[in-house]
């Protein structure tokens, strides 16, 4: 800390101002404000962050000392003002808590009561954010013995004013000789660390991480130092290196990483104007700019900043893991420790952990840097890697060069890992944490910490990739197989499971570069296969899977799966059942590893339907595609069998069906046709709208809620329906719109509740939905109010340019309207209102919400059921949609892109 810094705080000038004022409050406030401005300017000018936070602590020391002098403390030997916690370490950020302990010698301290109260009142009046406690030395000992947080705070203390001897006495009575011996303290701190990590999902890669509390955050470094202080009395990282727990290079890395997080935290406090440690979307752009990250694309600048953040916290996490394991080996050592068991000439087990037999193993036999992970996969009883061996791995990573990568011993070992029955994900994760994976596969190293600034991808690319491999592995476990029965069944019968793991490793490896990441990844995958001398068939499959890993989900979510041509085109693209099996399993794992909330019953049903229909097409033969007429005949025949068994007159059925049109039978299965037909035939002629609701437990819709509406056609039918559903808090995931020749509308919606689940067995909720829709459709002139819901905080920060594309389908007499835009409450209801205003008919719709974005496809016609052909009409339609999409967006949102 500085001894003198007149620009920051001039004691003489301050005391002169105090003498001139009747009340000291104004002088104190002025000094604090001016010093804060100086420190913020120095931060913007790039002043050393360590110096800045020490300077702020020095400033507060001076302010507190001057405030202390304003009062008569009588017997000054019996009281002391002590800084504890972070302030006790001499570290203060702009809005950090100033933790104070007023330490008393005797329990009887009535003589100080009035001065203490007035002193604390002054601190609050001048705007200091203080946390204070008033204790005697004996009370400190009593509370420290009972509370881990209290003893931790007291270990980090400085006397600001009063008797230093009191603090020394406090340290003596709270030492390891009296309480919290180092072993007990270490176990408590380790448990505290694990609980804190679990609170933040045990990952360094949260979208909005906490720079203090998240894994790899500042609290991890502090935990290591607390344990070291309790065990060895070391005060800082440099001293920790002196004890042999850190190499000098590791000390420098940890210190620079801490400095980076200090800069981020300082900027957070400064921008938020309060003690804010969460790196929220609200602040990421501003902090990126403040710290010098720039790009023509602001989103890219944020991604660069966050990638640096994630890499820093990963480094901290790795080094703290290393130190904590060292502590375990030293502090927890007992008489039974030291048992070793040989594994091979290079490795042995030491108390259940693998270790190198000597310090030269990796230097003499570099292939051992891969062998160690294969051994752990082959011996699942191994608990982990000894700290010294982790350090040896880190020290010898530089030996992994092109010669190493092309050595057949190493390529064989790497492939061997993927053939192990268990431990693939766990050991790939270890390889990534120790920096081996990114060295062996430089293309993987590029995606470490690579984030995508959106709500769809909640993990960095490397974390997502390893999560995908974890999901693939879990598909073989019974609890998971019950949730994903088809994917689990297929995973169990893949001829070479290692190929899907390798495809998963490379599927997103091209992200963060210019160009199509699927194509870039396929190029990298091909080179990998060649370098590892994989058979030609294996290589072709891996490359094809990487290149096409998005095709199945895109087709399922954006195409009309009831159209035989869509199925036939997809089957032609896939080519054979083996590829289909691999692609389906990879797609399921990819979606679940991207964002768990994306996997809902409706998305599952779409993929399962596409898989089943494609499999049938492949077995029938691509030269014999199922045509529309054949599909209609099959559906009608099966539905009629159901109805006749239930006692329905076939003639009544035939008469009804003659009015429904071909599209109806193409878009519904036999069970639904029978369900609809039975209800329609029983509906009185003047019974009003027919609204049917059921849990769609059929194979293709399992778990969703299907709403079928049959009513006389009216111009505003879709607009009224979606507005009413918005009022009912329903999310529409699919819409099938059909108008019969008798001018009746037959609409089917697949909906989920706002929480992503189906309606379930909830008669009250079903009645609420049925009554709400019936009332809205019975009185369409009372158009349901589009509820103005608050845009969620996170959505506000993702204003990307909306895209509106209008094109005509050469094979079908419809116009396709594609909309990609930021998600906003009530958006679909607003689009429905536009269709009403433009006199448009909706024939079909595919609705998809992916994080903060919607990707919706509408199949529309004009009032005469013809495709849109007037360019001016299309232009006006686009403009109207654009206005709705941009309503409420931030002014810096990019222009909307329209295509026709």
Swiss-Prot record:
Record GO terms (molecular function): [protein-PII] uridylyltransferase activity; phosphoric diester hydrolase activity
Cofactor(s) it depends on: Mg(2+)
Keyword hit for Nucleotidyltransferase: yes
Positions of region (Uridylyltransferase): 1-342
Enzyme Commission number, as recorded: 2.7.7.59, 3.1.4.-
HD domain location: 461-583
Catalytic reaction list: [protein-PII]-L-tyrosine + UTP = [protein-PII]-uridylyl-L-tyrosine + diphosphate; [protein-PII]-uridylyl-L-tyrosine + H2O = [protein-PII]-L-tyrosine + UMP + H(+)
Residue ranges of the region described as Uridylyl-removing: 343-705
InterPro entries the record matches: ACT-like_dom_sf (IPR045865), ACT_dom (IPR002912), HD/PDEase_dom (IPR003607), HD_domain (IPR006674), NT_sf (IPR043519), PII_UdlTrfase/GS_AdlTrfase (IPR013546), Polymerase_NTP_transf_dom (IPR002934), UTase/UR (IPR010043)
Keywords: Hydrolase, Magnesium, Multifunctional enzyme, Nucleotidyltransferase, Repeat, Transferase
CDD domains in the record: ACT_ACR-UUR-like_2, ACT_UUR-like_1, HDc, NT_GlnE_GlnD_like
Family annotation (Pfam families): ACT (PF01842), GlnD_UR_UTase (PF08335), HD (PF01966), NTP_transf_2 (PF01909)
Activity regulation (record text): Uridylyltransferase (UTase) activity is inhibited by glutamine, while glutamine activates uridylyl-removing (UR) activity.
Domain annotation ACT: ranges: 706-784, 816-900
Keyword Lipid metabolism: no
Gene Ontology BP terms: regulation of nitrogen utilization
Family designation: Belongs to the GlnD family.
Domain remark in the UniProt entry: Has four distinct domains: an N-terminal nucleotidyltransferase (NT) domain responsible for UTase activity, a central HD domain that encodes UR activity, and two C-terminal ACT domains that seem to have a role in glutamine sensing.
Stated role: Modifies, by uridylylation and deuridylylation, the PII regulatory proteins (GlnB and homologs), in response to the nitrogen status of the cell that GlnD senses through the glutamine level. Under low glutamine levels, catalyzes the conversion of the PII proteins and UTP to PII-UMP and PPi, while under higher glutamine levels, GlnD hydrolyzes PII-UMP to PII and UMP (deuridylylation). Thus, controls uridylylation state and activity of the PII proteins, and plays an important role in the regulation of nitrogen assimilation and metabolism.
Name under which the protein is recorded: Bifunctional uridylyltransferase/uridylyl-removing enzyme
Taxonomic source organism: Pseudomonas putida (strain W619)
Taxonomic lineage: Bacteria, Pseudomonadati, Pseudomonadota, Gammaproteobacteria, Pseudomonadales
Gene: glnD
């Amino acid at each position: 800390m500085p001894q003198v810094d007149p620009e920051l705080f001039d004691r003489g000038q301050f005391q002169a101002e105090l003498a001139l004022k009747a009340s000291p409050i104004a002088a104190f406030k002025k000094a604090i404000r001016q010093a804060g401005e100086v420190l913020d300017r120095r931060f913007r000018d790039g002043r050393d962050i360590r110096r800045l936070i020490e300077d702020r602590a020095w400033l507060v020391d001076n302010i507190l000392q001057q405030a202390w002098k304003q009062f008569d403390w009588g017997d000054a030997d019996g009281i002391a003002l002590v800084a504890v916690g972070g302030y006790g370490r001499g570290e203060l950020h702009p809005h950090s808590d100033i933790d104070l302990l007023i330490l008393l010698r005797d329990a009887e301290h009535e003589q100080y009561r009035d001065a203490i109260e007035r002193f604390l009142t002054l601190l609050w009046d001048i705007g200091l954010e203080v946390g204070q406690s008033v204790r005697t030395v004996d009370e400190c000992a009593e509370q420290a013995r009972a509370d881990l947080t209290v003893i931790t705070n007291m270990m980090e203390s400085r006397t600001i004013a009063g008797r230093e001897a009191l603090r020394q006495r406090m340290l003596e009575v709270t030492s390891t000789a009296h309480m919290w011996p180092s072993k007990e303290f270490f176990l408590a701190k380790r448990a505290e660390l694990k609980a804190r990590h679990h609170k933040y999902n045990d990952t360094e890669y949260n979208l909005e991480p906490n720079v203090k509390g998240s894994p790899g955050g500042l609290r991890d470094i502090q935990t290591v130092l607390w344990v070291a202080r309790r065990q060895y009395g070391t005060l800082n990282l440099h001293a920790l290196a002196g004890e042999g727990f850190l190499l000098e290079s590791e000390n420098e890395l940890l210190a620079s990483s801490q400095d980076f997080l200090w800069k981020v935290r300082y900027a957070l406090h400064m921008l938020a104007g309060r003690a804010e440690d969460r790196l929220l979307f609200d602040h990421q752009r501003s902090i990126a700019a403040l710290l010098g990250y720039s790009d023509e694309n602001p989103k890219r600048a944020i991604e660069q900043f966050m990638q640096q953040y994630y890499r820093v916290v990963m480094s901290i996490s790795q080094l703290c893991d290393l130190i904590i394991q060292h502590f375990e080996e030293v502090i927890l050592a007992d008489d039974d420790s030291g048992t070793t068991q040989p594994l091979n000439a290079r490795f042995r087990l030491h108390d259940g952990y693998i270790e190198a037999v000597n310090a030269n193993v990796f230097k003499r036999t570099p292939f051992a840097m891969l062998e160690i992970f294969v051994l752990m996969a082959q011996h699942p009883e191994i608990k982990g890697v000894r700290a010294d061996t982790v350090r040896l791995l880190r020290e010898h990573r530089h030996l992994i060069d092109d010669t190493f990568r092309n050595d057949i011993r190493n390529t064989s070992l790497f492939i061997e890992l993927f053939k192990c029955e268990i431990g693939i994900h766990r050991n790939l994760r270890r390889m990534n944490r120790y920096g081996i994976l990114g060295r062996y596969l430089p293309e993987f190293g590029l995606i470490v910490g690579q984030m995508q600034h959106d709500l769809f991808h909640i993990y960095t690319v490397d974390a997502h990739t390893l999560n995908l491999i974890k999901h693939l592995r879990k598909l073989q476990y019974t609890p998971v197989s019950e949730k994903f029965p088809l994917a689990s069944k297929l995973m169990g019968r893949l001829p070479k499971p290692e190929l899907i793991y390798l495809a998963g490793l490379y599927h997103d490896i091209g992200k963060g570069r210019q160009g199509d990441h699927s194509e870039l990844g396929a190029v990298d995958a091909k080179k990998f296969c060649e370098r590892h001398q994989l058979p030609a068939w294996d290589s072709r499959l891996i490359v094809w899977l990487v290149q096409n890993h998005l095709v199945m989900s895109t087709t399922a979510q954006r195409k009309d799966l009831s159209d035989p041509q869509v199925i036939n085109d997809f089957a032609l693209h896939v080519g054979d059942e083996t590829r289909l099996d691999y692609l389906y399993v990879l797609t399921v794992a990819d979606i679940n590893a991207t964002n768990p909330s994306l996997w809902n019953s409706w998305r599952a049903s779409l993929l399962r339907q596409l898989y089943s229909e494609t499999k049938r097409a492949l077995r029938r033969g691509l030269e014999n595609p199922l045509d529309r007429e054949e599909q209609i005949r099959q559906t009608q025949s099966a539905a009629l069998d159901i109805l006749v068994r239930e006692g329905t007159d076939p003639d009544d059925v035939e008469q009804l069906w003659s009015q429904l049109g071909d599209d109806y039978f193409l878009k519904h299965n036999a069970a639904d046709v029978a369900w609809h037909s039975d209800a329609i035939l029983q509906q009185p002629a003047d019974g009003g709208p027919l609204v049917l609701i059921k849990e769609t437990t059929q194979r293709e819709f399992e778990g969703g809620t299907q709403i079928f509406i049959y009513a006389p056609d009216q111009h505003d039918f879709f607009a009224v329906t979606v507005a009413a559903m918005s009022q009912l808090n329903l999310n529409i995931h699919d819409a099938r719109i059909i108008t019969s020749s008798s001018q009746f509308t037959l609409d089917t919606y697949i909906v989920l509740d706002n929480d992503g689940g189906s309606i379930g067995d909830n008669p009250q909720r079903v009645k609420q939905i049925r009554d709400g829709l019936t009332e809205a459709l019975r009185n369409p002139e009372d158009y349901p109010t589009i509820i103005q819901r608050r845009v969620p905080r996170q959505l506000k920060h993702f204003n990307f340019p909306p895209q509106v594309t209008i094109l005509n389908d050469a094979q079908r007499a419809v116009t396709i309207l594609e909309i990609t835009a930021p998600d906003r409450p009530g958006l679909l209801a607003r689009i429905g209102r536009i269709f009403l205003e433009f006199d448009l008919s909706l024939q079909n719709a595919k609705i998809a919400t992916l994080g903060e974005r919607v990707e919706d496809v509408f199949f529309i016609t004009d009032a005469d059921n013809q495709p849109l052909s007037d360019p001016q009409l299309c232009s006006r339609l686009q403009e109207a949609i654009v206005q709705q999409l941009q309503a409420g967006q931030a002014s810096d949102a990019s222009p909307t892109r329209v295509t026709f």
